[in-house]
Amino acid sequence: MTKIAVLGGGSWGTALANVAAENNNDVRLWTRTATQADEINSQHTNQKYLPDAKLSSELMATSNMALAVMDAEIVLTVVPTKVVREVARQLADVLNKQDHQVILAHATKGLEQVTYKRVSEMLAEEVPAKYRSTLAMISGPSHAEDVIKHDLTSVSIASENEEAAKLLQQVFANSSFRPYTNHDLLGSELAAALKNIIAIGSGALIGLGYGANAQAALLTRGLSEMRALGQAMGAQPETFLGLAGIGDLIVTGMSPNSRNYRAGKQLGEGKSLQEIQDDMGMVIEGVSTTKAVYEFSQHHHVEMPITAGIYRILYENEPLRDVISDLMSRPLRSED
């Protein structure tokens, strides 16, 4: 039995905590509010984020981070990108009061605004130095709504520390949840963030009434952009052809369970971004990631026309059909 603290009681944090608890691990889920923790402990539900799902009775929740992290061998943060530093600073305060080593992992798919930093970089800057050597990420095609129903799911666990990746693999693996390990943390984090941008575009095409041909073309050329930026930043190109790359892109860019896809679809149907964000009530990571990646690509001269087009839609209020027209009329070129 492994002691695991999961920080973040949203849909994905809850689903991952539930997988680990069902695998007979000692799991404590940290939530923002005592009300949410009480619901999970007494009713074994998390209705706000996973309506009608029944959670393991072995999963314990608390709004006290110190209690959640106490004696944990693994600490997994699963919070929106915009609050990673805030949560990491709270975690650092807790870790500073204990002296045993922990594996620090995350399952957040985004980049920090302005700095363009990946989640592992933010965590490394905030937590004590001795915890940085085990940083890892869980990513891949894994909607929480499917995981909680025990639909067959495979994920990627990326870490430069092979021992940490293998322990995470062991505690989460079961008959419906199969983790693979890889050592390209940089590429996995970039792929996880970048595919959210392309998913918004994919949903927008469907919302406008376009069909599978258009969607497949956008996903394929979007993958090319993801890979180009990844290589420019030092990632391994093959990572983008694995679960963390094309796997996550397919499910995020085509599934109605994807917030980014749904946001794009509603944009295509004529809703404003503000209306969509108000209605959804949950973070749409691709919106902020689009801005960060667009600015980064401009600064480093990486050509990303689809990302630039989605930026114009989200931040410059350019009509979707005008952006599509521009993309389709770009100078002809080879596919390479």
From Swiss-Prot:
Q: Which GO terms describe its biological process?
A: carbohydrate metabolic process; glycerol-3-phosphate biosynthetic process; glycerol-3-phosphate catabolic process; glycerophospholipid metabolic process; phospholipid biosynthetic process
Protein location: Cytoplasm
Q: Its principal location?
A: cytoplasm
**Function per UniProt:** Catalyzes the reduction of the glycolytic intermediate dihydroxyacetone phosphate (DHAP) to sn-glycerol 3-phosphate (G3P), the key precursor for phospholipid synthesis.
- Per UniProt, where does NADPH bind? 11-12, 32, 109, 144, 259, 283, 285
Binding residue positions for sn-glycerol 3-phosphate? 109, 140, 142, 195, 248, 258-260
Extract the InterPro entries matched here: 6-PGluconate_DH-like_C_sf (IPR008927), 6PGD_dom2 (IPR013328), G3P_DH_NAD-dep (IPR006168), G3P_DH_NAD-dep_C (IPR006109), G3P_DH_NAD-dep_N (IPR011128), NAD(P)-bd_dom_sf (IPR036291)
Q: Name one GO cellular component term.
A: cytosol
**Catalytic residues (UniProt):** 195
As its record notes, the protein acts as a catalyst of:
sn-glycerol 3-phosphate + NAD(+) = dihydroxyacetone phosphate + NADH + H(+); sn-glycerol 3-phosphate + NADP(+) = dihydroxyacetone phosphate + NADPH + H(+)
For this entry, the protein name equals: Glycerol-3-phosphate dehydrogenase [NAD(P)+]
Q: Which Gene3D superfamilies match?
A: N-(1-d-carboxylethyl)-l-norvaline Dehydrogenase, domain 2, NAD(P)-binding Rossmann-like Domain
Q: In which pathway does it act?
A: Membrane lipid metabolism; glycerophospholipid metabolism
Under Enzyme Commission nomenclature, its number is 1.1.1.94
GO molecular function annotation = glycerol-3-phosphate dehydrogenase [NAD(P)+] activity; NAD binding
Q: Looking at its record, which EC class is this enzyme?
A: oxidoreductase
Q: Name one Pfam family in it.
A: NAD_Gly3P_dh_N
Q: Which protein family is named in the record?
A: Belongs to the NAD-dependent glycerol-3-phosphate dehydrogenase family.
Origin organism of this chain?
Leuconostoc mesenteroides subsp. mesenteroides (strain ATCC 8293 / DSM 20343 / BCRC 11652 / CCM 1803 / JCM 6124 / NCDO 523 / NBRC 100496 / NCIMB 8023 / NCTC 12954 / NRRL B-1118 / 37Y)
Taxonomy of origin reads: Bacteria, Bacillati, Bacillota, Bacilli, Lactobacillales
